[in-house]
Structures are given as C-alpha cells and as structure tokens.
C-alpha cells in the first residue's frame, strides 16, 4: 500500500519544528516557574520592607518628641513594660510615668538636640524588629559632643508598633 505524503512519517522540517517546539515549551515552563518564584521572593522582600518602615516610625517619632522636649510624646512611642539597658544597668519601666528625661540636666551639659545618625534593621519577624542605632547629642553650635551605638527592639502589640527595649553601649564618645 502506498503511503500518502504527510501521513505516518514526519518530514525533516516537521521533526525540527517539533524538536524546537518542545524546547520552547520546556523553556517557557521553566521561565514561568522562575517568574512565579521571583514574585514570591519580591513579595516577601516587600513585606519585610513594609514591616521595617512601620516598625521604624516609633523611633523617628521618639527623636522628634525628644528634640521638642515633649516627654508625653516620647512616652507614647514606648511599649510597657519597657526595658532600658545602659552599660550593665537594667531598668524596667512598668508604666509611662516611669519614663523620665531631665531636660534641665541635659541643657546644663550643653545639650540642644539629638540626631538619629543611622538606624538599620538587623533581624525581624512579624511582630518584632531589632534595629542597630547610632545616635548623637549636639550643642547649640551644632557640634556633636556624644555619640552612642545602641540596639533598639521594637514590638507590635495589639496591632501597634512601639519601642520595647533600648540597650545603649557604654562605648559612646562623649566630650565635655
């Protein structure tokens, strides 16, 4: 029986077409999978970035309130109990009234304002972020007279981000 052209055996051109067609389908499948994976990675990075941004707000607000000499504003940025660690001294503040700043004492040493020189997220999860912080104290002539390295821990309690712990390293450069 005679075989019709196009039936049974594929021509060389059709074989190449099918070969490249399979490769293209596999490539598209791999690219689609990678694209999906990159979307997940991007979404996770965006979620972490948004968490860092939200968790950092109480730190920025704390410095704004501090420089305005607004003790109540500072208190509102903290979660209680609040832990302060300076050197090896640990202070636990049970309520907002426990948090005090002696602005007169600071003024007597020449303090006019403080700056948040750097604030970098080091670790995070959905409800807690660790920030490595560098802060400085300045005189009226803008000269810096003290710089401190610190670890600040910000937590999310009942949907609100607040500073839970401030640990300042005693190695700050302080000139008088």
What are these language model-derived features?
Residues 6-18:
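Juxtamembrane low-complexity tails/linkers enriched in Ser/Thr-Pro and polybasic
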Residues 145-176:
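Short beta-strand edge/turn micro-motifs at domain boundaries
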Residues 97-145:
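Surface-exposed, charged secondary-structure patches
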Residues 15-27:
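Membrane-penetrating hydrophobic segments
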Residues 85, 123-124, 156:
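Generic beta-strand structural signal
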Residues 83-93, 108-109:
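A short gly/proline-enriched turn/hairpin at secondary-structure junctions
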Residues 28-76, 80, 96:
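Short, low-complexity N-terminal intrinsically disordered segments enriched in polar/charged residues
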Residues 78, 88-89, 125, 133-135, ...:
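A mature extracytoplasmic/lumenal domain signature
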């Amino acid at each position: 029986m005679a075989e019709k052209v196009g039936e049974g055996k594929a021509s060389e051109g059709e074989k190449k077409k099918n070969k490249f067609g399979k490769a293209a389908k596999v490539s598209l499948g791999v690219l689609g999978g990678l694209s999906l994976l990159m979307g997940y990675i991007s979404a996770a990075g965006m979620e972490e970035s948004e968490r860092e941004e939200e968790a950092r707000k109480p730190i920025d607000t704390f410095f704004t309130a501090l420089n305005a000499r607004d003790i109540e504003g500072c208190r509102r940025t903290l979660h209680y109990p609040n832990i302060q660690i300076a050197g090896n001294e640990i202070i636990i503040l049970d309520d907002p009234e426990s948090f005090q700043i002696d602005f007169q004492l600071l003024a007597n040493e020449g303090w006019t304002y403080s700056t948040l020189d750097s604030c970098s997220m080091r670790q995070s999860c959905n409800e807690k972020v660790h920030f490595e912080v560098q802060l400085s104290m300045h005189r009226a002539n803008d000269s810096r007279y003290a710089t401190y390295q610190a670890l600040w821990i910000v937590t999310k309690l009942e949907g609100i981000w607040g500073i839970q712990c401030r640990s300042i390293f005693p190695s700050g450069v302080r000139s008088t």
